[in-house]
Amino acid sequence: MERAMEQLNRLTRSLRRARTVELPEDNETAVYTLMPMVMADQHRSVLELLSNSKFDVNYAFGRVKRSLLHIAANCGSVECLVLLLKRGADPNYQDISGCTPLHLAARNGQKKCMSKLLEYNADVNICNNEGLTAIHWLAVNGRTELLHDLVQHVTNVDVEDAMGQTALHVACQNGHKTTVLCLLDSGADINRPNVSGATPLYFACSHGQRDTAQILLLRGAKYLPDKNGVTPLDLCVQGGYGETCDILIQHHPRLFQTLIQMTQNEDLRENTLRQVLEHLSQQSEVQYLKILTGLAEVATTNGHKLLSISSSYEAQMKSLLRIVRIFCHVFRIGPSSPNNGNDMGYNGNKTPRNQVFKPLELLWHSLDEWLVLIATELTKNKRDSSNIACILLKQNQLDQQDISLAHQSAIGESGSYDHLSSSTRAEDFESCSAAGKQEPVADGQDVISMTANRLSAVIQAFYMCCSCQMPQGMTSPRFIEFVCKHDDVLKCFVTRNPKIIFDHFHFLLECPELMSRFMHIIKAQPFKERCEWFYEHLLAGQPDSDMVHRPVNENDILLVHRDSIFRSSCEVVFKSNCEKLKQGIAVRFHGEEGMGQGVVREWFDILSSEIINPDYALFTQSADGTTFQPNSNSSVNPDHLNYFRFAGEILGLALYHRQLVNIYFTRSFYKHILGIPVNYQDVASIDPEYAKNLQWILDNDISDLGLELTFSVETDVFGAMEEVPLKPGGASILVTQENKAEYVQLVTELRMTRAIQPQINGFLQGFHMFIPPSLIQLFDEYELELLLSGMPEIDVNDWMKNTEYTSGYERDDQVIQWFWEVVQELTQEERVLLLQFVTGSSRVPHGGFAYIMGGSGLQNFTIAAVAYTPNLLPTSSTCINMLKLPEYPSKEILKDRLLVALHCGSYGYTMA
């Protein structure tokens, strides 16, 4: 009866408390009953369950083998923790990782739990498996108020973990100022190294903790490297921690020069160096000028080393340009930027700010002398080149003197660079013949080969320094004068090694007046290399990423409708930010989920076809049936100019992101995009017969023909004939044999340009939002078509099948056999160039070569014989699709001459 009553009481208590009132006898089961109660600090329930139980309070359970005391300490369950301690829980029991309850309480900042554990003799000096003690955990998390209570129980405040790190190390690394002060006041060793030799100051600098670094330095911390020689300053620069660098330099001024010298270290990232120097330069005007002067001196020294042929070109070139880039960046962020019109760099370097360029004048002086001497000696020694070797020897000796002078300047010697006159050095050259005889004799071309790249890199540095002193968009008059002065030598450099243009002559892209001097050399470079140069500069400054990506912001997605793709695309593109479109494109069709590059390609493909849709009246089909020209009557559509701007944006955007468009324009329209003047040959695309008539006028004497032409033409203006003068007073000026070329050019401009000028302007306004005019001029009209529309596949067998032969050639002639063998050997790009060379188009019409159009309709590809003379190049008549092929004596000569014509240009337009 008594037992039954006891069971009934247990049942009643269980139901009232909604839990069991007895622990299972099995420890494993019992502990999982108690654990949630301990976590919730339900100490009364825990006490009740433990009172009538034989449960082992030190029972370790779970994967990490912790006791309930660990759980209580970890969760801050103070009442349960005290209860467990009173019932015999071991405060120093370690789990599988070596952590005691005190470790867990310290890690989580459980102050009351820590106090009770210490009352019950918890050992503060126990280390876990990684060597961490309770004070390490407090230091990691900055629990200063708890640390004050704990350190009085610690026998060794410098106890080390497995890596030799003390609590001071980790507190400094994590930037806990009060914790660092507490540890130092408790006797922590301020210079104690870990196993790799890293001190607390090293740790503070590794994470840019300026406040803890400041405390350490004020308390007398030593500036020590680790065992690998890495210093606290190295760490600050690697992380871009400008504020911490500033603290180090304030306490150790000698580190300033070390920092400046670090700009030569190619292992350090340039952007972090910039961040550090940018911060330091903004602290004061004096420091700003000091940094720039230091950088200028280092650049000068490196520049002279680069001019010495005994140095490593690649390493010295990269070092010089790197230093100069950093110099220019720091200069631009100064108190008075050139962009705001104050303190211009072309004012003669009179202001203190521009005096920082003075050390560089020594380098520019050496550069100028090198170029003058090479020009002089090449002219003087065209036949006898023995003296030119002397240049190399003597100039290097003088450059070594310049390096010494630069060093003297760096340590504070003042003086003028003007004493290094050209006449002084010219006198030195008079006595260098003996020295020259001691060296292997090199001719002028060898000297250029050895020095061109080095001098060109210094020229690039000179341009960068000149440019950073100018407002945006302006070219330094000094640099323009420099290029004009040394024009012949610079052209000699790039003729000998065209890669110099792409490697060092970036100034050409930013200065049209200089670009024009080198354009013929640039255009002669391989198409592929110019493409790489184009995109290198086009994408400069853009983050490295997949160019066509899904933006994070949903608002950046272009949402368009398939059934109104032209108008809906026009709306969303006009609303979009141009810079965001440069960073990436994401397109989604309304009602569809698909996104990605495939959708973007489809969008460009469909949209480019819509641009030439007759419904919008923007473009009209040309005479060849495959290309399009702006419609002079597009004004029938009220929004036509906005639509032309949109068309320009789409083609510019496609070119920017290397997406091909399914549209081909007339040769003249490509010229308009490139800024190339049109000529009478371009008229053939819209009116072949009229083009022939213009050709006839040019080819024949019109003096006695009685044409009575004037400088005016009759034009149909909305159904009414109007006389339009080609120039002021043109209706009264007769066309004569003397002025007929002007007449042909003016009438061409009327038909091909003036009639569609508003449309061209609208298109270019949109196109130039993405493609700068200076970059696109790297290409001709044929190459621009390839850039925009890609390279078509060419069936050589179909080409052979539909080719005619004239002027003495037959299908089986040896020269013809060689020709087709060469065509088979050409790359796809070269075949397209050949097709363009002869037909003026890179495309084969639908149906193949049998449907190629000429000036008067269908006209097969034709090869005509021409008498051979040495070095004669093939020519073409694009109006009649004729290749004029000399009767070359060998296949090798044929291939060589053909490739020269294709790559260097030998286009012609003649009558049949």
Swiss-Prot record:
Keywords: ANK repeat, Cell cycle, Cytoplasm, Endoplasmic reticulum, Golgi apparatus, Membrane, Repeat, Transferase, Ubl conjugation pathway
Residue ranges constituting the HECT domain according to the UniProt record: 577-912
Active site: 879 (glycyl thioester intermediate)
Broadest EC class assigned to this enzyme: transferase
SUPFAM superfamilies for the chain: Ankyrin repeat (SSF48403), Hect, E3 ligase catalytic domain (SSF56204)
CDD domains documented for this protein: HECTc (cd00078)
Cellular-component GO terms for this entry: endoplasmic reticulum; Golgi cisterna membrane; Golgi membrane
Pathway: Protein modification; protein ubiquitination
Pfam family, one: Ank_2
Main location: Golgi
Catalytic reaction(s) noted: S-ubiquitinyl-[E2 ubiquitin-conjugating enzyme]-L-cysteine + [acceptor protein]-L-lysine = [E2 ubiquitin-conjugating enzyme]-L-cysteine + N(6)-ubiquitinyl-[acceptor protein]-L-lysine
GO terms under biological process: Golgi organization; membrane fusion; protein K48-linked ubiquitination; protein ubiquitination; regulation of cell migration; ubiquitin-dependent protein catabolic process
The keyword Repeat appears for this protein: yes
EC number per UniProt: 2.3.2.26
GO MF assignments: small GTPase binding; ubiquitin-protein transferase activity
Name listed for the protein in its UniProt record: E3 ubiquitin-protein ligase HACE1
Organism of this sequence: Xenopus tropicalis (Western clawed frog)
